[in-house]
From Swiss-Prot:
Binding site residues for tRNA: 18, 69, 71, 117
Organism: Prochlorococcus marinus subsp. pastoris (strain CCMP1986 / NIES-2087 / MED4)
One term of GO molecular function: peptidyl-tRNA hydrolase activity
Function: Hydrolyzes ribosome-free peptidyl-tRNAs (with 1 or more amino acids incorporated), which drop off the ribosome during protein synthesis, or as a result of ribosome stalling. Catalyzes the release of premature peptidyl moieties from peptidyl-tRNA molecules trapped in stalled 50S ribosomal subunits, and thus maintains levels of free tRNAs and 50S ribosomes.
Protein name: Peptidyl-tRNA hydrolase
Enzyme Commission code: 3.1.1.29
Taxonomic lineage: Bacteria, Bacillati, Cyanobacteriota, Cyanophyceae, Synechococcales
The gene coding this protein: pth
Length: 203
């Protein structure tokens, strides 16, 4: 990271009916982030996203919530990357992950989609797997082999419970602090710290 800008894109689905869905955890993190620093989101049609920016310690933070649906997230990410001519090491994608326990964080600098349709579309549109993604665990749906697909959909599109919110609030706090601290000198340390973080162990 050689520039004093960080580009953070949270994935989710637009629309009031999706606001509190587990699948919208990327949006929820960025809303917490912008609120903490008194910044508002405005719609930028050319970027296919809602956009917020603010400065902390000489760094400019540019936050984006795509107004495409999750499965078309790559359209917004491609528009953002092209407009700002972003080096991908300064880009951070925030997503939910059903394969991680609730509250677990996993930071990866590259890799496959892991079955996440939003990440899959970004890989397709950018034509590379080499970009940062920060996964937040939402836990797995109840096991029911006969209705596995249905259970997964209902789980990710289900609303976050009040108990889950208590867990995720601590995760948001940790991630926001880490994204602010992150720089080219401490990157490996921050990534390791995030990957070892689990809400239950840090109460």
């Amino acid at each position: 990271m050689n520039n004093n800008e960080k580009f953070i894109i949270g994935l989710g689905n637009p629309g009031k009916e999706y606001i509190q869905n587990r699948h919208n955890i990327g949006f929820l993190l960025l809303e917490n982030f912008s609120e903490k620093y008194d910044s508002k989101f405005t719609l930028k049609n050319k970027l296919k996203s809602w956009y917020s920016e603010f400065k902390i310690n000489n760094f400019t933070y540019r936050l984006f919530m795509p107004n495409t649906f999750m499965n078309n997230s790559g359209n917004a990410v491609r528009a953002i990357v092209d407009w700002y001519k972003i080096d991908l090491d300064r880009l951070f994608i925030i997503v939910d992950d059903i394969d991680l326990p609730l509250g677990k964080i996993r930071f990866r600098k590259k890799g496959s989609s892991g079955g996440h349709n939003g990440i899959k579309d970004i890989i397709n549109k950018l034509q590379t797997e080499n970009f940062n993604r920060i996964k937040i665990g939402i836990g797995s749906p109840p096991v029911n082999e006969r209705k596995k697909t249905l259970n997964t959909i209902s789980h990710v599109l289900g609303n976050i419970s009040s108990k889950e919110s208590l867990t995720l609030d601590r995760v948001y706090k940790k991630l926001i602090e880490s994204l602010i601290e992150l720089n080219d000198k401490n990157e490996d340390y921050i990534i390791s710290e995030l990957n070892s973080f689990h809400r239950e162990e840090n109460l």
